[in-house]
């Protein structure tokens, strides 16, 4: 069974909503090619959340779950139907969350997915999951080994950021064509290269974290810019 509900920006304490100024694009900062100049301001949004509850689930029991970006994702639910029936994965809940609209620097989606912090994980933990449990009589595990995140493109880098910065919450990550490149905005001096820092500095210089990461990228998924941090294939290879 797939349930859906809508979340409004006015109800969020974490993401009140932004959008890039219409008709504008991010431009390279001539003083630092790793930075972007962006015109952006407050803007409301609505987002849909789809919750997959398999027929094998016993209401009220604790279950593992996966959180997906850029939802709703019907293909994920179909895949889980088959995998659960084949007993290749346990009976699990899936929460597929739409982004807050827009794309890249200055957008709500970019703010959520490309920011190098645990803020999106906090949003999911405090604003999304309690609604899921309350509305659909499900209990979501607190065990990080039984919690997974997944996403494609910037949703992929967000999935890893959720586990990296909130390792107390997530240990399992799936990414497709993860944007492990320099997409972050606003600029953060603690991670000047955005998600490029995962392979340039964070992973090499940090103690080992209990994260299991599955990655996929196609060899033609390639886009480069002069700052050297916008090559999707290279970024995933470096990971």
Task: Describe each PLM feature range.
Residues 1-239:
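Non-catalytic cap/lid and distal C-terminal segments of serine-dependent acyl enzymes
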């Amino acid at each position: 069974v797939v349930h859906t509900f809508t979340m409004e920006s006015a109800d969020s304490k974490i993401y009140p909503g932004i959008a890039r100024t219409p008709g504008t694009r991010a431009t390279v900062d001539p003083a630092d090619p790793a930075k972007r100049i962006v015109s952006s301001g407050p803007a409301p949004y609505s987002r849909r959340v789809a919750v997959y509850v398999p027929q094998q689930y016993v209401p009220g029991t604790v279950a593992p779950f996966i959180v997906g970006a850029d939802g709703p994702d019907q293909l994920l639910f179909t895949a889980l139907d088959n995998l659960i029936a084949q007993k290749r994965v346990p009976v699990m809940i899936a929460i597929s969350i739409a982004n807050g609209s827009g794309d890249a620097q200055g957008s709500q989606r970019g703010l959520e997915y490309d920011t190098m912090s645990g803020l999106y994980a906090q949003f999911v933990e405090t604003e999304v999951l309690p609604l899921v449990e309350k509305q659909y009589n499900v209990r979501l595990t607190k065990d990080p080994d039984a919690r997974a995140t997944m996403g494609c493109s910037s949703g992929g880098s967000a999935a890893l950021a959720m586990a990296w910065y909130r390792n107390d919450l997530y240990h399992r990550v799936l990414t497709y064509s993860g944007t492990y490149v320099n997409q972050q905005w606003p600029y953060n001096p603690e991670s000047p290269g955005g998600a490029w820092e995962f392979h340039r500095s964070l992973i090499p210089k940090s103690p080992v974290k209990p994260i299991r990461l599955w990655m996929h990228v196609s060899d033609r998924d390639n886009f480069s810019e002069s700052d050297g941090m916008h090559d999707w294939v290279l970024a995933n290879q470096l990971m």
